[in-house]
Amino acid sequence: MYVAMNRFKVVKGSEQAFEDVWKNRNSSLSEMPGFREFHLLRGPLNEAEAYTLFASHTLWESERDFIAWTKSENFRASHRNAGGNKPLYLGHPVFEGFTSVEGA
């Protein structure tokens, strides 16, 4: 199993707009081989730096399936307009990928 996450620092006050982008997106993830599930996670508010931490979390059968998704036309189509949402978050999303430890 493979977990792919992107962490976003969402500008304080923009949380609902950020969530709406995800809720209203056209997703083709379920069409991709190896895709299991998606979750958008809301983390803590950092008052000092004025952002709320969010993470997009996808679960895949394997890292190979995830990489195939990133090279697919579906991936390109789903990220085509992502730049228009940059005012909602600080900096670039930070990617983290994890492979499950079998038997643990």
What would you call each of these model-derived segments?
Residues 2, 50-52:
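Residue-level preference for beta-strand/loop junctions
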Residues 10-18:
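Short, surface-exposed ligand-recognition loops at beta-strand->loop->(often short) alpha-helix junctions
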Residues 41, 96-103:
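Flexible, low-complexity linkers/stalks enriched in Thr/Pro that connect modular domains
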Residues 44-50:
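Acidic pyrophosphate-coordinating catalytic loop
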